[in-house]
Amino acid sequence: MKNKFIVLCFLSATCIFIFSQCSENTATKKEPEMKQKFGGFESQVKWGEHLVLLGGCSDCHTPKKMTPKGPVNDETLFMSGHTEGMPAPDIDRKEVESKGLVVTQTLTAWVGPWGISYSGNLTPDETGIGTWTESNFLTAIKEGKYKGISASRPLMPPMPWEQMKKLSDDELK
């Protein structure tokens, strides 16, 4: 009787093992957690477009054109900054500097107590940031340095680099 019980247990264990190996695994495989690269966006370009929108980069770096509804981005000059052909603000700087701030109609040049600021060209062209390294870009944003060069002058108002520096390196890359 004892031998029958051992044989029965062995056969049962063998059957269970065989059935468990032959049965179709219907359990859903958990997909490996992907590192959230690009903030959940499908590409680095889409992530960059999102950051430009949220950061308001084109508010100052894309010249505006006037319409019946007010200023709108001139998409033909997207992120080109205050371009070479645009006139400098024609104002009495001493009066402006004592009273506050003046902004041009294109919203790409500002006059204030610090002097005159012109928004930079952020296009991928060599006249913009096309020749910058990743390090230059991070230095400009994190340290507020002109052209991303540590030994250069600070970025001028109204560039909000003090707020932008709070973005992580991964967000900025």
PLM region spans:
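Bacterial N-terminal signal peptides that target proteins for export
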Residues: M1-C9
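Electrostatic cytochrome c docking/interface patches
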Residues: K29-L53, K65-K69
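Periplasmic/extracellular electron-transfer cofactor-ligation site
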Residues: E49, L53-G115, G144-R153
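An amphipathic alpha-helix signature
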Residues: E134-L138, K142, D169, K173
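Hydrophobic helical h-region of N-terminal Sec-dependent signal peptides
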Residues: F10-I16
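Axial heme c-ligation environment in periplasmic c-type cytochrome domains
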Residues: T104, W110-G130, K145-D170
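C-terminal motif of bacterial Sec signal peptides marking the signal peptidase cleavage site
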Residues: I18-Q21
